[in-house]
Each structure stands twice: as C-alpha cells, then as structure tokens.
Amino acid sequence: MEILLQLIYSGIALGMIYAVIAFGYQLTFQTSDTLNFGQGDALMLGAMVGLTLVNMGVNFWLMLPIVIAFGLVQGALVERIGVAPAIKIKSEFGWIMSTIALGIIFKNVAENIWGRDDLKFPSPLPEAPLKFLGANVLPMEILVVVGAILMMVAVEFFNRKTIYGKAVVATFNDRDAAKLMGINTGLVITFSYALSSATAGFAGALIAPLTLTGATMGAVLGLKAFAVAIIGGLTSGLGIIVGGIILGIAETTTGFYISTGYKDVPGLVLLLLVLAFKPSGLFGKLAIKKV
C-alpha cells in the first residue's frame, strides 16, 4: 500500500506538469483554433534558461519570474513568425508546419548552446522525502503540484477579472464579433501564445530538478501533454487537470508493476478510446459551427 501511495504521489506531480503544458495548448486553441506544436520545446528552453541562471548564482525563486518573462517573449515570437501569417491567409496547415519547424530550430539552438548531454538541475528544496499518509513524497513533488495549480489559477483569474483577460474570453467566444467590438484580436492571439509558452517554461523550470535537463527533454513531455489536452478536452480546464493526473498515475503504476517499457501504453490506449468515442474530450464540449 505504501508503494502504491508513493506511485500515486509521483503520478500526480507528473500529471500536473502535463496539465500545465496542456493548459498552454488550450490557451492558443481558445483564441485562434491553432496549437503550438513546439510547446515541448518552450518547456525545454524554460528549463535550460533556468539552469543557466541558477548556475550563475541566481536564486531559484528569483529565476522563476525571469523564465516566465523569457517564455512570454519566445511565445510571442512564435506567433508573429509562424502563426500570424498562416492565419492571415487562412491556411489550414501552415501554422502546424511553422510551429513544428520553429520547435526544431529552438531544439537545435539549445543543442549548440548547452550541448546534447543531459544536465543535473540542483533542487532548491531538501531531497530527503517526507512522510504523508504513510508514504514518502519528495518536497519538490509537492512544489510541482502547488506551483502548477497556482499558475493555472493565476491565468484563470487574469482571464476572468482583467480587461485584457475579458478580451481573450470574448475572442474565444466569437472572434469576428470581438473584432467588430473594437478588440484587437491579433494582439489577443499573440498574447495567448506568449502566455502559453510562459506556462510551459514555468513547468520546465519546476520539473527540471526532478529529472535530467537537456535539449531533448521537451519532445516527449510536449507530446504527452498534447495527449492530455485531447483526453481532457481542449475547451475544459478541469478536463485537462483530470486528464493529466490520470495519465501521470497510469504511467508511474504501469512502469512499476508491469514494465517501464509499457508505461506509455495506458495513456495511448485511453487517447485512442477518447478519439473513437468522444473526440471532444472527456470534459470538452462539442463545437458546432455554422457554415
């Protein structure tokens, strides 16, 4: 029972990271019906920039807002270069290829700056586990869960309580109507991409002390977060959290009780089932568009 609880704790921490990254997918989808397929590389850049700052002597807690600011700039750059031109000419696939290409470029740049070897990110908290309900849990895992929740709550608060956030919601509800009301929907979309990459960079800096940090770390995490977004629903924040936790726990328990070689299988099976029987996601709403 103790081992199972530990696996659940680790799975929840991993799942919340997936959820934060998937939350970034949701932000861009809501405003522009597009996704940043380089989201995993935004996470990687956040982790690598964070590692560089920590190695330079910057305090971990001061490093986090710097990483978020870096993510904002990186995300805005992706939207301006790769997405805005595709939206302007109403290209169905241009933004897909552009975000993938930019993700590859960021990965190659990271390899040239930091090398291809994985690096150890020093933990800001003690590495000795704590006892919780009879099982061990790492302090860093607790920080990951708390940090992920705070980030998503902060973004939701911004969307609901600020004027610019309400512009984001209006653009999501009806982009054409928002434009007629004088809302600069292009700027809103740019900001949604900036916020998306900022959340991914923040997630990268949080998860880095629990794993090895390197130029390739974002590819798998980004792909799994995309699966979480599809499983939970791209229109549901709650669905993304639930989907992330389900996938995280499924991976940790499968890896321990069966084999690490099969830890990705449950999530992929669930993804296929959701796509087959509820394409809008477990908590998502089916969109109906007039043509």
Give the positions of each predicted feature.
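Helix-loop-helix "hairpin" substructures at the membrane interface of multi-pass membrane proteins
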Residues: 14-15, 136-214, 237-243
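Hydrophobic alpha-helical transmembrane segments of polytopic membrane proteins
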Residues: 20, 71, 224-247, 251, ...
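Inter-helical junctions in multi-pass inner-membrane proteins, predominant
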Residues: 2-11, 17, 158-159, 163, ...
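Membrane-interfacial amphipathic/re-entrant helices at transmembrane-helix boundaries
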Residues: 1-21, 49, 61-63, 89-93, ...
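Short, non-helical or kinked segments that cap or interrupt transmembrane helices
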Residues: 25-46, 89-94, 164, 185, ...
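Alpha-helical transmembrane segments within multi-pass membrane transporters and channels
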Residues: 58-102, 109, 242-247, 278-279
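Transmembrane helix-bundle core of multi-pass membrane transporters
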Residues: 85-86, 90-161, 188, 253, ...
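Membrane-embedded helix boundary and interhelical linker motif in transport proteins
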Residues: 31-77
